[in-house]
Amino acid sequence: MCGIVGFIGSHQAAPILLDGLSKLEYRGYDSAGLAVRDGDAPVQIVKAKGRLKALAEKTNNGETLKGTCGIGHTRWATHGEPSETNAHPHCSDDGNVVGVHNGIIENYQELKDKLVRKGYTFYSSTDTEAAIKLIDYYYKKYEGTPVDAINHAMVRIRGSYALAVMFRDYPGEIYVARKDSPMILGVTDGECYVASDVPAILKYTRQVYYIGNMEMARLADGAVTFYNLDGDEISRELTEIEWDAEAAEKGGFEHFMMKEIHEQPKAVADTLSSVIRDGRLDLSGVGLTEEEIQGISQIHIVACGSAYHVGAVAQYVMEDLAEIPVLIDVASEFRYRKTLLAPKSLVIVISQSGETADSLAALREAKQCGVKTLAIVNVVGSSIAREADNVFYTMAGPEIAVATTKAYSTQLIAVYCLALQFALVRGKMDEKRYSTLLEELQTIPEKIGKILEDKERIQWFAAKNSMAKDVFFIGRGVDYAVSLEGSLKLKEISYIHSEAYAAGELKHGTISLIENGTLVIGVLTQEQLYEKTLSNMAECRSRGAYLMGLTSYGRYDIEDAVNFAVYVPRIDEHFAASLAVIPLQLLGYYVSVARGLDVDKPRNLAKSVTVE
Protein backbone atom coordinates (compact mmCIF):
# COMPACT_ATOMS: atom_id res chain seq x y z
CA MET A 1 0.00 0.00 0.00
CA CYS A 2 1.34 3.42 -1.00
CA GLY A 3 4.33 3.65 -3.28
CA ILE A 4 7.74 5.27 -2.83
CA VAL A 5 10.25 6.05 -5.57
CA GLY A 6 13.53 7.95 -5.30
CA PHE A 7 16.33 8.82 -7.72
CA ILE A 8 19.79 10.41 -7.66
CA GLY A 9 21.94 10.59 -10.78
CA SER A 10 22.85 12.55 -13.87
CA HIS A 11 19.39 12.39 -15.51
CA GLN A 12 16.39 14.57 -14.74
CA ALA A 13 14.63 13.00 -11.76
CA ALA A 14 10.97 13.93 -12.26
CA PRO A 15 10.27 11.86 -15.42
CA ILE A 16 11.96 8.85 -13.81
CA LEU A 17 9.94 9.31 -10.61
CA LEU A 18 6.66 9.55 -12.53
CA ASP A 19 7.54 6.46 -14.54
CA GLY A 20 8.40 4.54 -11.38
CA LEU A 21 5.20 5.60 -9.65
CA SER A 22 3.19 4.43 -12.67
CA LYS A 23 4.65 0.95 -12.12
CA LEU A 24 3.38 1.05 -8.52
CA GLU A 25 -0.21 2.02 -9.31
CA TYR A 26 -1.30 -1.55 -8.58
CA ARG A 27 -0.52 -0.91 -4.90
CA GLY A 28 -3.53 1.40 -4.65
CA TYR A 29 -3.53 5.17 -4.09
CA ASP A 30 -5.69 8.28 -3.95
CA SER A 31 -3.12 11.07 -4.44
CA ALA A 32 0.48 11.54 -5.52
CA GLY A 33 3.37 13.95 -5.23
CA LEU A 34 6.99 14.72 -6.13
CA ALA A 35 9.84 16.57 -4.45
CA VAL A 36 12.77 17.42 -6.74
CA ARG A 37 15.97 19.34 -6.10
CA ASP A 38 18.48 20.83 -8.52
CA GLY A 39 21.85 21.12 -6.79
CA ASP A 40 21.79 23.64 -3.93
CA ALA A 41 18.47 25.14 -5.05
CA PRO A 42 15.40 24.79 -2.79
CA VAL A 43 13.29 21.67 -3.11
CA GLN A 44 10.28 21.94 -5.42
CA ILE A 45 7.18 20.06 -4.23
CA VAL A 46 4.17 19.33 -6.45
CA LYS A 47 1.13 17.28 -5.35
CA ALA A 48 -2.17 16.24 -6.89
CA LYS A 49 -5.28 14.44 -5.70
CA GLY A 50 -6.56 11.54 -7.78
CA ARG A 51 -4.80 9.54 -10.46
CA LEU A 52 -1.15 9.92 -11.36
CA LYS A 53 -2.26 11.51 -14.61
CA ALA A 54 -3.20 14.66 -12.67
CA LEU A 55 0.34 14.96 -11.28
CA ALA A 56 1.83 14.35 -14.72
CA GLU A 57 -0.35 17.11 -16.19
CA LYS A 58 0.67 19.52 -13.42
CA THR A 59 4.35 18.99 -14.20
CA ASN A 60 4.12 18.50 -17.97
CA ASN A 61 5.21 14.89 -17.49
CA GLY A 62 7.95 16.04 -15.15
CA GLU A 63 9.49 18.54 -17.55
CA THR A 64 8.75 21.59 -15.36
CA LEU A 65 10.51 20.12 -12.32
CA LYS A 66 14.23 20.47 -12.95
CA GLY A 67 16.70 18.54 -10.84
CA THR A 68 18.61 15.29 -10.64
CA CYS A 69 17.66 14.30 -7.10
CA GLY A 70 14.12 13.60 -5.96
CA ILE A 71 11.52 11.46 -4.25
CA GLY A 72 7.96 10.57 -5.26
CA HIS A 73 4.97 9.00 -3.58
CA THR A 74 1.51 7.60 -4.22
CA ARG A 75 -0.65 7.82 -1.10
CA TRP A 76 -3.34 5.51 0.23
CA ALA A 77 -5.25 7.48 2.87
CA THR A 78 -5.00 6.15 6.42
CA HIS A 79 -4.70 9.30 8.55
CA GLY A 80 -6.53 12.20 6.93
CA GLU A 81 -8.81 12.28 3.90
CA PRO A 82 -7.51 12.07 0.32
CA SER A 83 -6.47 15.62 -0.55
CA GLU A 84 -3.63 17.61 -2.04
CA THR A 85 -2.71 18.88 1.43
CA ASN A 86 -2.46 15.38 2.89
CA ALA A 87 -0.57 14.01 -0.12
CA HIS A 88 3.16 13.38 0.23
CA PRO A 89 5.91 14.62 0.21
CA HIS A 90 5.70 16.46 3.54
CA CYS A 91 8.21 18.95 4.87
CA SER A 92 9.34 20.63 8.08
CA ASP A 93 8.21 24.18 8.87
CA ASP A 94 11.26 25.75 7.24
CA GLY A 95 11.63 23.19 4.44
CA ASN A 96 14.83 21.81 5.96
CA VAL A 97 13.59 18.20 5.82
CA VAL A 98 11.35 16.77 3.09
CA GLY A 99 10.15 13.18 3.06
CA VAL A 100 7.69 10.48 2.06
CA HIS A 101 6.43 7.56 4.10
CA ASN A 102 4.70 4.22 3.69
CA GLY A 103 3.12 2.55 6.71
CA ILE A 104 1.27 3.60 9.85
CA ILE A 105 2.79 5.53 12.76
CA GLU A 106 0.73 4.40 15.71
CA ASN A 107 1.87 7.07 18.18
CA TYR A 108 1.69 9.99 15.77
CA GLN A 109 -0.70 11.99 17.98
CA GLU A 110 1.70 11.71 20.91
CA LEU A 111 4.59 12.84 18.68
CA LYS A 112 2.53 15.65 17.21
CA ASP A 113 1.58 16.96 20.67
CA LYS A 114 5.24 16.96 21.69
CA LEU A 115 6.28 18.85 18.57
CA VAL A 116 3.52 21.43 18.99
CA ARG A 117 4.86 22.13 22.47
CA LYS A 118 8.28 22.63 20.88
CA GLY A 119 6.83 25.26 18.55
CA TYR A 120 6.08 23.24 15.41
CA THR A 121 2.90 23.84 13.42
CA PHE A 122 0.98 21.30 11.35
CA TYR A 123 -0.82 21.80 8.05
CA SER A 124 -2.07 18.24 7.34
CA SER A 125 -3.95 15.45 9.08
CA THR A 126 -1.30 12.82 8.35
CA ASP A 127 0.94 10.77 10.58
CA THR A 128 3.74 11.29 8.05
CA GLU A 129 4.05 15.01 8.77
CA ALA A 130 4.72 14.18 12.42
CA ALA A 131 7.53 11.80 11.42
CA ILE A 132 9.21 14.31 9.10
CA LYS A 133 9.05 17.08 11.70
CA LEU A 134 10.34 14.74 14.39
CA ILE A 135 13.40 14.05 12.23
CA ASP A 136 13.84 17.80 11.74
CA TYR A 137 13.55 18.36 15.50
CA TYR A 138 16.34 15.89 16.31
CA TYR A 139 18.49 17.14 13.46
CA LYS A 140 18.43 20.64 14.93
CA LYS A 141 18.54 19.62 18.58
CA TYR A 142 21.69 17.50 18.36
CA GLU A 143 23.27 19.25 15.37
CA GLY A 144 24.39 15.89 14.08
CA THR A 145 24.15 14.11 10.74
CA PRO A 146 20.96 13.05 8.96
CA VAL A 147 21.67 9.49 10.09
CA ASP A 148 21.79 10.64 13.73
CA ALA A 149 18.49 12.50 13.38
CA ILE A 150 16.72 9.59 11.69
CA ASN A 151 18.15 7.23 14.30
CA HIS A 152 16.69 9.27 17.17
CA ALA A 153 13.32 9.41 15.41
CA MET A 154 13.23 5.67 14.72
CA VAL A 155 13.69 4.90 18.40
CA ARG A 156 10.64 7.00 19.25
CA ILE A 157 8.29 6.04 16.42
CA ARG A 158 5.94 3.11 17.02
CA GLY A 159 4.41 1.35 14.05
CA SER A 160 5.53 0.36 10.58
CA TYR A 161 7.25 2.60 8.10
CA ALA A 162 9.47 3.00 5.09
CA LEU A 163 10.89 6.53 4.89
CA ALA A 164 12.75 8.39 2.15
CA VAL A 165 14.05 11.79 3.25
CA MET A 166 16.03 14.69 1.78
CA PHE A 167 17.89 17.36 3.82
CA ARG A 168 18.49 20.92 2.66
CA ASP A 169 22.06 20.80 4.03
CA TYR A 170 22.87 17.65 2.04
CA PRO A 171 22.05 18.25 -1.65
CA GLY A 172 22.29 15.23 -3.93
CA GLU A 173 21.60 12.78 -1.11
CA ILE A 174 18.61 10.68 -0.04
CA TYR A 175 18.30 8.95 3.31
CA VAL A 176 16.02 5.98 3.88
CA ALA A 177 14.89 3.88 6.84
CA ARG A 178 12.48 1.01 7.29
CA LYS A 179 10.63 -1.00 9.90
CA ASP A 180 8.19 -3.69 8.81
CA SER A 181 7.46 -1.98 5.49
CA PRO A 182 9.14 -2.96 2.20
CA MET A 183 11.86 -0.96 0.47
CA ILE A 184 14.57 -1.78 -2.05
CA LEU A 185 17.54 0.25 -3.25
CA GLY A 186 18.94 -0.02 -6.78
CA VAL A 187 22.26 1.06 -8.27
CA THR A 188 23.63 1.33 -11.80
CA ASP A 189 26.19 3.48 -13.64
CA GLY A 190 26.67 5.98 -10.84
CA GLU A 191 22.95 6.40 -10.19
CA CYS A 192 20.81 5.29 -7.23
CA TYR A 193 17.15 4.34 -6.96
CA VAL A 194 14.67 3.87 -4.11
CA ALA A 195 11.42 1.92 -4.48
CA SER A 196 8.70 0.16 -2.54
CA ASP A 197 8.71 -2.69 -5.04
CA VAL A 198 10.79 -4.09 -7.88
CA PRO A 199 8.64 -3.06 -10.91
CA ALA A 200 9.27 0.64 -10.19
CA ILE A 201 12.97 0.38 -11.03
CA LEU A 202 13.18 -2.78 -13.15
CA LYS A 203 13.42 -0.66 -16.30
CA TYR A 204 16.57 1.01 -14.99
CA THR A 205 18.46 -1.61 -13.00
CA ARG A 206 18.33 -5.18 -11.78
CA GLN A 207 21.08 -4.65 -9.20
CA VAL A 208 19.40 -4.07 -5.85
CA TYR A 209 19.98 -4.04 -2.12
CA TYR A 210 17.38 -5.13 0.40
CA ILE A 211 17.57 -2.85 3.42
CA GLY A 212 17.06 -4.77 6.65
CA ASN A 213 14.47 -4.13 9.32
CA MET A 214 15.32 -1.21 11.64
CA GLU A 215 18.13 -0.11 9.34
CA MET A 216 18.99 3.12 7.55
CA ALA A 217 20.85 3.94 4.34
CA ARG A 218 22.45 6.94 2.67
CA LEU A 219 22.31 7.22 -1.14
CA ALA A 220 24.87 9.56 -2.69
CA ASP A 221 27.44 9.65 -5.50
CA GLY A 222 26.13 6.43 -7.03
CA ALA A 223 26.69 4.38 -3.88
CA VAL A 224 24.68 3.18 -0.88
CA THR A 225 25.93 3.13 2.71
CA PHE A 226 23.98 1.16 5.32
CA TYR A 227 23.66 1.82 9.05
CA ASN A 228 22.21 -0.09 11.98
CA LEU A 229 20.10 1.47 14.72
CA ASP A 230 23.25 2.50 16.59
CA GLY A 231 24.40 4.51 13.59
CA ASP A 232 27.27 2.13 12.82
CA GLU A 233 28.06 1.30 9.19
CA ILE A 234 27.09 -2.21 8.13
CA SER A 235 27.35 -4.13 4.88
CA ARG A 236 24.60 -5.43 2.64
CA GLU A 237 24.92 -7.83 -0.28
CA LEU A 238 24.01 -6.67 -3.79
CA THR A 239 21.39 -8.91 -5.41
CA GLU A 240 20.47 -9.30 -9.07
CA ILE A 241 16.75 -9.42 -9.87
CA GLU A 242 16.06 -12.17 -12.42
CA TRP A 243 12.87 -10.61 -13.77
CA ASP A 244 13.15 -8.65 -17.01
CA ALA A 245 11.59 -5.25 -17.64
CA GLU A 246 9.19 -6.59 -20.28
CA ALA A 247 7.57 -8.80 -17.64
CA ALA A 248 6.18 -5.66 -15.99
CA GLU A 249 4.52 -4.43 -19.24
CA LYS A 250 1.14 -5.41 -20.74
CA GLY A 251 2.64 -7.04 -23.81
CA GLY A 252 -0.25 -6.28 -26.15
CA PHE A 253 -3.04 -7.28 -23.77
CA GLU A 254 -5.70 -4.76 -22.79
CA HIS A 255 -5.13 -5.40 -19.08
CA PHE A 256 -2.39 -6.86 -16.91
CA MET A 257 -4.88 -9.32 -15.45
CA MET A 258 -5.60 -10.94 -18.82
CA LYS A 259 -1.89 -11.03 -19.62
CA GLU A 260 -1.20 -12.72 -16.30
CA ILE A 261 -4.02 -15.22 -16.80
CA HIS A 262 -2.34 -16.23 -20.08
CA GLU A 263 1.07 -16.41 -18.41
CA GLN A 264 -0.09 -19.14 -16.06
CA PRO A 265 1.02 -22.13 -18.16
CA LYS A 266 4.57 -20.76 -18.22
CA ALA A 267 4.55 -19.68 -14.57
CA VAL A 268 3.35 -23.12 -13.48
CA ALA A 269 5.89 -24.86 -15.74
CA ASP A 270 8.71 -22.66 -14.42
CA THR A 271 7.75 -23.40 -10.82
CA LEU A 272 7.67 -27.13 -11.52
CA SER A 273 10.99 -27.11 -13.37
CA SER A 274 12.61 -25.31 -10.44
CA VAL A 275 12.01 -28.31 -8.16
CA ILE A 276 11.94 -31.35 -10.48
CA ARG A 277 15.24 -33.07 -11.31
CA ASP A 278 15.48 -36.32 -13.29
CA GLY A 279 11.83 -37.16 -12.82
CA ARG A 280 11.78 -36.56 -9.06
CA LEU A 281 11.08 -33.68 -6.74
CA ASP A 282 14.21 -32.04 -5.38
CA LEU A 283 13.26 -29.75 -2.51
CA SER A 284 16.79 -29.36 -1.20
CA GLY A 285 16.55 -25.67 -2.01
CA VAL A 286 13.57 -25.35 0.32
CA GLY A 287 15.73 -26.53 3.19
CA LEU A 288 13.61 -29.09 5.05
CA THR A 289 15.47 -32.32 5.80
CA GLU A 290 13.85 -35.75 5.60
CA GLU A 291 14.26 -36.07 9.36
CA GLU A 292 12.38 -32.81 9.89
CA ILE A 293 9.62 -33.89 7.50
CA GLN A 294 9.22 -37.21 9.27
CA GLY A 295 8.95 -35.43 12.61
CA ILE A 296 6.17 -33.00 11.68
CA SER A 297 3.24 -33.47 14.05
CA GLN A 298 0.89 -30.97 12.45
CA ILE A 299 0.88 -28.16 9.89
CA HIS A 300 -0.50 -24.65 10.39
CA ILE A 301 -1.03 -22.65 7.20
CA VAL A 302 -1.27 -18.89 7.69
CA ALA A 303 -2.19 -16.48 4.88
CA CYS A 304 -4.50 -13.70 3.68
CA GLY A 305 -6.93 -13.38 0.77
CA SER A 306 -6.23 -15.64 -2.20
CA ALA A 307 -3.20 -17.13 -0.45
CA TYR A 308 -5.56 -18.27 2.30
CA HIS A 309 -7.65 -19.99 -0.36
CA VAL A 310 -4.50 -21.82 -1.48
CA GLY A 311 -4.21 -22.94 2.13
CA ALA A 312 -7.76 -24.28 1.97
CA VAL A 313 -6.79 -26.45 -1.01
CA ALA A 314 -3.60 -27.49 0.77
CA GLN A 315 -5.55 -28.69 3.79
CA TYR A 316 -7.49 -31.21 1.70
CA VAL A 317 -4.50 -32.32 -0.37
CA MET A 318 -1.92 -32.60 2.42
CA GLU A 319 -4.22 -34.40 4.82
CA ASP A 320 -5.28 -36.88 2.14
CA LEU A 321 -1.84 -37.60 0.67
CA ALA A 322 0.59 -37.06 3.55
CA GLU A 323 -1.85 -37.83 6.39
CA ILE A 324 -0.68 -34.86 8.45
CA PRO A 325 -3.26 -32.81 10.38
CA VAL A 326 -3.53 -29.37 8.76
CA LEU A 327 -5.04 -26.22 10.24
CA ILE A 328 -5.49 -22.99 8.30
CA ASP A 329 -5.62 -19.52 9.81
CA VAL A 330 -6.36 -16.06 8.51
CA ALA A 331 -3.10 -14.26 9.28
CA SER A 332 -4.80 -11.22 10.78
CA GLU A 333 -6.40 -13.47 13.42
CA PHE A 334 -3.53 -15.86 14.07
CA ARG A 335 -1.66 -13.86 16.69
CA TYR A 336 -4.71 -12.51 18.48
CA ARG A 337 -5.71 -15.80 20.02
CA LYS A 338 -3.88 -18.30 22.14
CA THR A 339 -2.47 -20.42 19.35
CA LEU A 340 -1.49 -23.85 20.61
CA LEU A 341 1.45 -24.94 18.47
CA ALA A 342 2.77 -28.42 19.19
CA PRO A 343 6.59 -28.62 19.52
CA LYS A 344 7.01 -30.28 16.12
CA SER A 345 4.51 -28.16 14.24
CA LEU A 346 5.39 -26.67 10.87
CA VAL A 347 3.95 -23.23 10.17
CA ILE A 348 3.61 -22.46 6.45
CA VAL A 349 3.16 -18.78 5.56
CA ILE A 350 1.93 -18.02 2.03
CA SER A 351 2.38 -14.55 0.52
CA GLN A 352 2.96 -13.43 -3.06
CA SER A 353 4.86 -10.28 -2.12
CA GLY A 354 6.54 -11.63 0.97
CA GLU A 355 5.66 -8.32 2.62
CA THR A 356 2.03 -8.86 3.72
CA ALA A 357 1.99 -7.23 7.16
CA ASP A 358 -0.38 -9.66 8.89
CA SER A 359 1.41 -12.70 7.46
CA LEU A 360 4.79 -11.32 8.50
CA ALA A 361 3.49 -10.71 12.02
CA ALA A 362 2.12 -14.27 12.15
CA LEU A 363 5.48 -15.63 11.00
CA ARG A 364 7.23 -13.80 13.82
CA GLU A 365 4.68 -15.08 16.31
CA ALA A 366 5.34 -18.65 15.16
CA LYS A 367 9.10 -18.19 15.44
CA GLN A 368 8.70 -16.88 18.97
CA CYS A 369 6.89 -20.13 19.78
CA GLY A 370 9.99 -21.99 18.63
CA VAL A 371 8.45 -23.98 15.79
CA LYS A 372 9.79 -24.52 12.28
CA THR A 373 8.55 -22.10 9.62
CA LEU A 374 8.33 -22.35 5.84
CA ALA A 375 7.41 -19.51 3.50
CA ILE A 376 5.85 -19.82 0.05
CA VAL A 377 6.66 -16.49 -1.61
CA ASN A 378 7.22 -15.04 -5.06
CA VAL A 379 9.69 -12.26 -4.27
CA VAL A 380 13.29 -13.19 -3.53
CA GLY A 381 14.74 -11.24 -0.62
CA SER A 382 11.35 -10.13 0.73
CA SER A 383 10.86 -9.80 4.49
CA ILE A 384 8.98 -13.09 4.89
CA ALA A 385 11.55 -14.91 2.75
CA ARG A 386 14.41 -13.54 4.84
CA GLU A 387 12.85 -14.33 8.20
CA ALA A 388 11.39 -17.80 7.55
CA ASP A 389 13.50 -20.87 8.33
CA ASN A 390 12.79 -22.36 4.91
CA VAL A 391 11.53 -20.90 1.63
CA PHE A 392 9.73 -22.30 -1.41
CA TYR A 393 10.02 -19.69 -4.16
CA THR A 394 7.27 -19.64 -6.77
CA MET A 395 8.28 -18.58 -10.27
CA ALA A 396 5.33 -16.39 -11.18
CA GLY A 397 7.42 -13.37 -12.10
CA PRO A 398 6.06 -9.87 -11.44
CA GLU A 399 2.31 -9.77 -10.95
CA ILE A 400 0.90 -6.28 -11.51
CA ALA A 401 -2.89 -6.68 -11.49
CA VAL A 402 -4.38 -6.32 -8.02
CA ALA A 403 -6.43 -9.51 -8.48
CA THR A 404 -3.96 -12.38 -8.31
CA THR A 405 -4.00 -15.13 -10.92
CA LYS A 406 -0.60 -16.61 -11.72
CA ALA A 407 0.72 -16.16 -8.17
CA TYR A 408 -2.26 -18.15 -6.87
CA SER A 409 -1.63 -20.88 -9.44
CA THR A 410 2.06 -21.19 -8.62
CA GLN A 411 1.28 -21.28 -4.90
CA LEU A 412 -0.98 -24.25 -5.60
CA ILE A 413 1.94 -25.97 -7.32
CA ALA A 414 4.10 -25.35 -4.26
CA VAL A 415 1.63 -27.00 -1.89
CA TYR A 416 1.14 -29.94 -4.27
CA CYS A 417 4.89 -30.51 -4.36
CA LEU A 418 5.16 -30.30 -0.58
CA ALA A 419 2.26 -32.73 -0.18
CA LEU A 420 3.83 -35.28 -2.54
CA GLN A 421 7.25 -35.05 -0.93
CA PHE A 422 5.85 -35.24 2.60
CA ALA A 423 3.76 -38.28 1.63
CA LEU A 424 6.75 -40.10 0.13
CA VAL A 425 9.19 -39.32 2.94
CA ARG A 426 6.67 -40.27 5.64
CA GLY A 427 5.89 -43.60 3.94
CA LYS A 428 2.30 -42.74 3.07
CA MET A 429 2.82 -43.24 -0.66
CA ASP A 430 4.73 -45.84 -2.67
CA GLU A 431 7.09 -45.02 -5.53
CA LYS A 432 4.61 -46.00 -8.22
CA ARG A 433 1.90 -43.71 -6.91
CA TYR A 434 4.46 -40.94 -6.40
CA SER A 435 5.68 -41.18 -10.01
CA THR A 436 2.13 -41.27 -11.37
CA LEU A 437 1.09 -38.14 -9.48
CA LEU A 438 4.28 -36.32 -10.36
CA GLU A 439 3.68 -37.03 -14.06
CA GLU A 440 0.09 -35.85 -13.67
CA LEU A 441 1.32 -32.66 -12.00
CA GLN A 442 3.45 -31.87 -15.03
CA THR A 443 0.41 -31.94 -17.34
CA ILE A 444 -1.13 -28.88 -15.66
CA PRO A 445 0.52 -26.20 -17.87
CA GLU A 446 -0.74 -27.80 -21.10
CA LYS A 447 -4.22 -28.30 -19.67
CA ILE A 448 -4.45 -24.67 -18.52
CA GLY A 449 -3.53 -23.66 -22.05
CA LYS A 450 -6.35 -25.80 -23.42
CA ILE A 451 -8.88 -24.07 -21.13
CA LEU A 452 -7.70 -20.65 -22.31
CA GLU A 453 -8.43 -21.64 -25.91
CA ASP A 454 -12.14 -21.75 -25.07
CA LYS A 455 -12.38 -18.42 -23.22
CA GLU A 456 -14.91 -16.89 -25.65
CA ARG A 457 -17.72 -19.00 -24.14
CA ILE A 458 -16.92 -17.56 -20.71
CA GLN A 459 -16.88 -14.07 -22.23
CA TRP A 460 -20.38 -14.59 -23.65
CA PHE A 461 -21.72 -15.88 -20.33
CA ALA A 462 -20.07 -13.03 -18.41
CA ALA A 463 -21.61 -10.38 -20.65
CA LYS A 464 -25.04 -11.95 -20.21
CA ASN A 465 -24.73 -11.96 -16.41
CA SER A 466 -22.72 -8.79 -15.84
CA MET A 467 -25.61 -7.05 -14.07
CA ALA A 468 -26.26 -9.83 -11.57
CA LYS A 469 -27.16 -8.58 -8.12
CA ASP A 470 -25.95 -11.56 -6.09
CA VAL A 471 -23.81 -14.55 -7.02
CA PHE A 472 -23.27 -17.66 -4.93
CA PHE A 473 -20.47 -20.18 -5.50
CA ILE A 474 -20.85 -23.66 -4.03
CA GLY A 475 -18.74 -26.80 -3.89
CA ARG A 476 -17.54 -29.58 -1.62
CA GLY A 477 -14.01 -30.51 -0.60
CA VAL A 478 -11.41 -29.03 -2.93
CA ASP A 479 -14.27 -27.62 -5.00
CA TYR A 480 -15.35 -25.51 -2.02
CA ALA A 481 -11.80 -24.16 -1.70
CA VAL A 482 -11.89 -23.22 -5.41
CA SER A 483 -15.30 -21.62 -4.92
CA LEU A 484 -13.80 -19.30 -2.30
CA GLU A 485 -11.28 -18.04 -4.83
CA GLY A 486 -13.84 -17.77 -7.63
CA SER A 487 -16.11 -15.68 -5.44
CA LEU A 488 -13.29 -13.38 -4.40
CA LYS A 489 -12.22 -12.87 -8.00
CA LEU A 490 -15.72 -11.83 -8.99
CA LYS A 491 -16.43 -9.49 -6.10
CA GLU A 492 -13.08 -7.71 -5.98
CA ILE A 493 -13.02 -6.57 -9.59
CA SER A 494 -16.71 -6.45 -10.59
CA TYR A 495 -18.11 -5.12 -7.29
CA ILE A 496 -20.95 -7.65 -7.46
CA HIS A 497 -21.93 -9.12 -4.12
CA SER A 498 -20.67 -12.67 -4.12
CA GLU A 499 -20.23 -15.38 -1.50
CA ALA A 500 -18.91 -18.94 -1.47
CA TYR A 501 -20.44 -21.70 0.61
CA ALA A 502 -19.79 -25.34 1.27
CA ALA A 503 -22.64 -26.83 -0.75
CA GLY A 504 -23.95 -28.84 2.17
CA GLU A 505 -24.38 -25.65 4.22
CA LEU A 506 -26.93 -24.12 1.85
CA LYS A 507 -29.84 -25.74 3.64
CA HIS A 508 -28.63 -24.32 6.99
CA GLY A 509 -29.72 -20.79 6.19
CA THR A 510 -28.19 -19.51 2.98
CA ILE A 511 -30.81 -21.02 0.71
CA SER A 512 -33.26 -18.43 2.05
CA LEU A 513 -31.35 -15.85 -0.02
CA ILE A 514 -32.00 -17.67 -3.29
CA GLU A 515 -34.70 -16.05 -5.39
CA ASN A 516 -35.76 -15.89 -9.00
CA GLY A 517 -32.74 -15.10 -11.21
CA THR A 518 -30.05 -15.49 -8.54
CA LEU A 519 -26.86 -16.77 -10.19
CA VAL A 520 -25.48 -19.89 -8.52
CA ILE A 521 -22.17 -21.34 -9.74
CA GLY A 522 -21.38 -24.90 -8.76
CA VAL A 523 -17.89 -26.41 -8.94
CA LEU A 524 -18.03 -30.19 -9.40
CA THR A 525 -14.63 -31.76 -10.11
CA GLN A 526 -14.59 -34.28 -7.23
CA GLU A 527 -16.15 -37.49 -8.52
CA GLN A 528 -17.32 -38.81 -5.14
CA LEU A 529 -19.03 -35.51 -4.33
CA TYR A 530 -20.50 -34.80 -7.77
CA GLU A 531 -24.00 -36.14 -7.14
CA LYS A 532 -24.32 -34.43 -3.77
CA THR A 533 -23.33 -31.02 -5.13
CA LEU A 534 -25.59 -31.48 -8.15
CA SER A 535 -28.44 -32.20 -5.75
CA ASN A 536 -27.72 -28.94 -3.90
CA MET A 537 -27.78 -27.07 -7.20
CA ALA A 538 -31.15 -28.62 -8.01
CA GLU A 539 -32.48 -27.25 -4.73
CA CYS A 540 -31.37 -23.79 -5.85
CA ARG A 541 -32.93 -24.18 -9.28
CA SER A 542 -36.28 -25.14 -7.78
CA ARG A 543 -36.21 -21.75 -6.05
CA GLY A 544 -35.60 -19.84 -9.27
CA ALA A 545 -31.80 -19.78 -9.43
CA TYR A 546 -29.92 -19.52 -12.73
CA LEU A 547 -27.23 -22.21 -12.68
CA MET A 548 -23.71 -22.47 -14.05
CA GLY A 549 -21.91 -25.77 -13.56
CA LEU A 550 -18.14 -26.24 -13.80
CA THR A 551 -17.00 -29.84 -14.11
CA SER A 552 -14.59 -32.17 -15.92
CA TYR A 553 -14.73 -33.42 -19.51
CA GLY A 554 -17.03 -36.41 -19.82
CA ARG A 555 -19.61 -35.25 -17.29
CA TYR A 556 -21.96 -34.03 -20.00
CA ASP A 557 -25.02 -35.12 -18.04
CA ILE A 558 -24.65 -31.86 -16.14
CA GLU A 559 -26.22 -30.05 -19.10
CA ASP A 560 -29.60 -31.49 -18.12
CA ALA A 561 -29.32 -29.87 -14.68
CA VAL A 562 -27.80 -26.42 -15.32
CA ASN A 563 -28.37 -23.46 -17.62
CA PHE A 564 -24.72 -23.17 -18.65
CA ALA A 565 -21.90 -25.69 -18.38
CA VAL A 566 -18.13 -25.19 -18.42
CA TYR A 567 -15.69 -28.06 -18.78
CA VAL A 568 -12.05 -28.48 -17.82
CA PRO A 569 -9.69 -31.34 -18.75
CA ARG A 570 -9.64 -34.37 -16.49
CA ILE A 571 -6.84 -34.57 -13.95
CA ASP A 572 -6.20 -36.30 -10.65
CA GLU A 573 -8.70 -34.79 -8.24
CA HIS A 574 -5.99 -33.59 -5.85
CA PHE A 575 -4.85 -31.13 -8.54
CA ALA A 576 -8.27 -30.17 -9.91
CA ALA A 577 -8.16 -26.70 -8.31
CA SER A 578 -5.43 -25.66 -10.75
CA LEU A 579 -7.79 -26.18 -13.68
CA ALA A 580 -11.15 -25.27 -12.15
CA VAL A 581 -9.93 -21.83 -11.09
CA ILE A 582 -9.09 -20.72 -14.65
CA PRO A 583 -12.68 -20.32 -15.93
CA LEU A 584 -13.53 -18.50 -12.69
CA GLN A 585 -10.65 -16.06 -13.20
CA LEU A 586 -11.88 -15.43 -16.73
CA LEU A 587 -15.44 -14.98 -15.49
CA GLY A 588 -14.41 -12.30 -13.00
CA TYR A 589 -12.32 -10.54 -15.65
CA TYR A 590 -14.99 -10.52 -18.35
CA VAL A 591 -17.77 -9.41 -15.98
CA SER A 592 -15.61 -6.48 -14.86
CA VAL A 593 -14.86 -5.52 -18.47
CA ALA A 594 -18.54 -5.76 -19.39
CA ARG A 595 -19.33 -3.38 -16.54
CA GLY A 596 -16.72 -0.89 -17.79
CA LEU A 597 -14.57 -1.08 -14.65
CA ASP A 598 -10.84 -0.70 -14.05
CA VAL A 599 -9.85 -4.37 -13.97
CA ASP A 600 -6.24 -3.92 -12.88
CA LYS A 601 -6.90 -1.33 -10.17
CA PRO A 602 -10.24 -2.02 -8.46
CA ARG A 603 -11.48 0.55 -5.98
CA ASN A 604 -10.31 0.50 -2.36
CA LEU A 605 -7.86 -2.35 -2.95
CA ALA A 606 -4.08 -2.60 -2.90
CA LYS A 607 -1.90 -5.34 -4.36
CA SER A 608 0.37 -5.68 -1.35
CA VAL A 609 -1.20 -4.93 2.04
CA THR A 610 1.80 -3.79 4.06
CA VAL A 611 -0.11 -2.35 7.03
CA GLU A 612 -2.13 -4.30 9.60
What role is predicted for each listed range?
Residues Q294-T436, E440-T443, V523-P569, L587, ...:
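Glycine-rich phosphate-binding loops that contact phosphosugars or nucleotide phosphates
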Residues Q264-V268, L272-H300, N390-L519, S592-E612:
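Active-site phosphate/pyrophosphate-binding segments
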Residues G231, Y546, E559-A561, I571-E612:
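Generic C-terminus detector
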Residues M1-E254, K266-S273, R277-S297, Y336, ...:
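Conserved short alpha-helical segments that host acidic/polar catalytic motifs at enzyme active sites
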Residues F7-S10, T121, S125, Y139-E143, ...:
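Hydrophobic alpha-helical scaffolding
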Residues T68, G72-T85, V275-E291, A314-I350, ...:
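Glycine-rich oxoanion-binding loops at beta->alpha junctions
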